[in-house]
Design a protein with these regions (language model features):
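Polar, enzyme-active/binding microenvironments
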Residues: 1-240
Length: 240
């Protein structure tokens, strides 16, 4: 796997096998080709956790203001300044899959409790934001819109939350591979600002996140297959 050459410390044999199985599953499901970035943060070293596995060296994460890394768990924000910058700006990126009416973003949160700060964000006109569980016991996600987010009831913020836009008029929210809500609001052009985990422009999350990524829109079957692949990776890492 190309990403292994970009890792300063090679993963254990067990983790290498899990990487290969996960990425092979995403390729076979037709998901890999649609991604701009995939980050598996619940691994053995912080440097490997920040790699964009789709294209190492491009859109690798920058840990800003010292989010806390825990091996085989992920990265935790502090609720005030710490976050992970994807270094991906949808306006200045070269040939991105993530575009106005064909885009998705996802994050695997390990935080059960509620907070009104998003686990993934890009604030301003053209918002792309994901909340695993707000204090209203709802989860929300929106992609390239300033309008109301797609939402659903949520009393547990843990799991894979995935916001998707395949057309100009509708966005959809998925939890653990299943559709949980749609929202019929028109898209806005993405803004010239980096996507980030654990923050928007002014709000910072204290959650722990294990995985994340973004790219073009995914089908419902893709969403289910993404969850299956990432869940298998997480289960495998938990057992190492």
């Amino acid at each position: 796997m190309t990403a292994f050459r970009a890792m300063t410390t090679q993963p254990s044999s067990g983790l290498k096998s899990l990487y290969n199985t996960c990425i092979t599953s995403l390729i076979n499901a037709g998901i890999w080709a649609k991604l701009d970035a995939l980050y598996l943060m619940n691994v053995e070293t912080a440097q490997a956790a920040r790699l964009n596995l789709k294209n190492p060296g491009t859109y690798d994460l920058t840990a800003t203001s010292s989010p806390t890394f825990t091996a085989k768990v992920g990265y935790k924000g502090d609720g005030s300044t710490a976050y992970l910058d994807t270094n991906f700006n949808p306006i200045t990126a070269s040939g991105p899959k993530f575009v106005q009416d064909n885009a998705s973003a996802f994050v695997w949160s390990l935080q059960q409790t509620a907070e009104n700060n998003p686990q993934l964000g890009q604030a301003g006109s053209g918002n792309t934001i994901i909340y695993g569980r707000r204090t209203t016991d709802t989860m929300q996600g929106q992609v390239n819109t300033t309008s109301t987010a797609a939402g659903a009831a949520s009393t547990d913020g843990r799991g894979l939350i995935h916001a998707n836009r395949a057309v100009s008029t509708t966005q959809e929210l998925f939890k653990n591979g299943a559709s949980v809500g749609t929202d019929a609001h028109a898209s806005n052009a993405p803004i010239s600002a980096n996507l980030a985990f654990l923050r928007t422009s002014v709000l910072f999350s204290a959650a722990t996140i294990a995985m994340g990524g973004f790219g073009g829109a995914l089908t419902s079957q893709n969403a289910a297959d993404l969850y299956t692949a990432l869940s298998a990776f997480k289960t495998g890492v938990d057992a190492l």
